[in-house]
Amino acid sequence: MNPRLRHWREAASVLLAAGAPGRRSPSPLGPCDYELLFLQRSSRSGFMPSAHVFPGGLVEAADFSAEWLRLLPAAPRCGLGAVRPPPPGGSRAPLFATDRQPLGSPLPGEVAFRICAIRETFEEAGILLLAPGGRPREGSGPAPSLPAEQLLPAAELGEWRRRVQEDPACFLQLCQRLGRVPDIWALQEWSNWLTPVGRAGRGGRRYDTAFYLCCLETRPPHTSQDNQEIAAFLWSSPPEAIERFKSQEIWLAPPQFYELCRLCNFSSLNDLHKFSSDRALEGCERWLPVTLTAADGFIQLLPGDELYPEDPDYTGEKKITMSTDKMVEDLMKEGSVFHRIVIKNTHSLAVYVNIQAKYKHMNPLMINTDSSNYNSRL
């Protein structure tokens, strides 16, 4: 945790992809042999109520506990590889770059945020992403799902889930009980999103969220919503999720929509796993979407876009607003260097990117939910 932060809180989330071979995809984007886990937030939530999101939540002091060092390997970063220096003109996301020692934790942020994402996945969805012993899993493919017979009886596991929800420190006790550790090595660093100033939830809630990607061989056998923060769960391929969003079956916030468009580049779980593993040590930068209000909608500008400010107002203290009387279509015709999400209404989103992706990452497919041409190029 970072108690020095005043304008947002730190969080972690995981894009959990599970193999689904032989499935049929009705999407015009084509077949896909894996599914993602989506959780529908409660309608009573103070932040993005009823939205379909990836598992995750706020980092807690227990995620940074020195006690984890008794379970995890003693190697530097608990066996995680060292992220390479950022490219020229780039920067390491502060979320990961912050030295946690002066903040009272010997556990690196790269480890603690993974523990947070794994703990939250158990709290919200009942899924345990654990590995045996205190060493990285051998093998280069997607991680195996923890078999049901290796878990505790359902009633006992449910009681542990309730305890962890009430006290995150109990997650370490659960791992000790099972003789397993959080499978931090299965989570690959993927992206980092900071809530825009003008899109804060009730009480001005903003989050600096680490997004990880985790590929599992098969869907876990024990998924269930908690009926507290989470009202329902859904397993869906990225193309199908976009179709559901387009038909207003589900609602996705812009970061989730963007990441789905990026995942639509991968129809194979093995290809996705290899890509995420190969580029994970490249790291990522923090993205703060900056909102430009147009006459008929909004444009969320992302780093690299020609209209993205040189000095973004990260805290909101400058009270800077960007607005124009021009229509979105006119702004698109006038521009040439794009990294943006166009928002006409809650179910009308379009991603436009024609810049080179940094950190050896993949640009999203440029998808406009108002168009049937999903692979549109500018």
Swiss-Prot record:
Cystine pairings recorded for this chain: none
Reaction equation(s) it catalyzes: an acyl-CoA + H2O = an acyl-4'-phosphopantetheine + adenosine 3',5'-bisphosphate + 2 H(+); CoA + H2O = (R)-4'-phosphopantetheine + adenosine 3',5'-bisphosphate + 2 H(+); hexanoyl-CoA + H2O = hexanoyl-4'-phosphopantetheine + adenosine 3',5'-bisphosphate + 2 H(+); octanoyl-CoA + H2O = S-octanoyl-4'-phosphopantetheine + adenosine 3',5'-bisphosphate + 2 H(+)
EC category name: hydrolase
Alphabetical UniProt keywords: Hydrolase, Magnesium, Manganese, Metal-binding, Peroxisome
GO CC annotation terms, alphabetical: peroxisome
Cofactor(s) in the UniProt record: Mg(2+); Mn(2+)
E.C. designation(s): 3.6.1.-, 3.6.1.77
Site (Important for coenzyme A binding): 41, 47, 205
One GO biological process term: succinyl-CoA catabolic process
Subcellular location: Peroxisome
Domain named Nudix hydrolase: residues: 7-258
Chain location of the short sequence motif Nudix box per the record: 105-126
Main location: other
Superkingdom classification of source: Eukaryota
A GO MF label: magnesium ion binding
UniProt short sequence motif Microbody targeting signal, positions renumbered to this chain: 376-378
Functional summary from the UniProt entry: Fatty acyl-coenzyme A (CoA) diphosphatase that hydrolyzes fatty acyl-CoA to yield acyl-4'-phosphopantetheine and adenosine 3',5'-bisphosphate. Mediates the hydrolysis of a wide range of CoA esters, including choloyl-CoA and branched-chain fatty-acyl-CoA esters and at low substrate concentrations medium and long-chain fatty-acyl-CoA esters are the primary substrates. Highest activity seen with medium-chain acyl-CoA esters and higher rates of activity seen with the unsaturated acyl-CoA esters compared with the saturated esters. Exhibits decapping activity towards dpCoA-capped RNAs in vitro.
Protein family according to the UniProt entry: Belongs to the Nudix hydrolase family.
Subunit structure: Monomer.
Protein's recorded name: Acyl-coenzyme A diphosphatase NUDT19
Taxonomic classification: Eukaryota, Metazoa, Chordata, Craniata, Vertebrata
Gene designation per UniProt: NUDT19
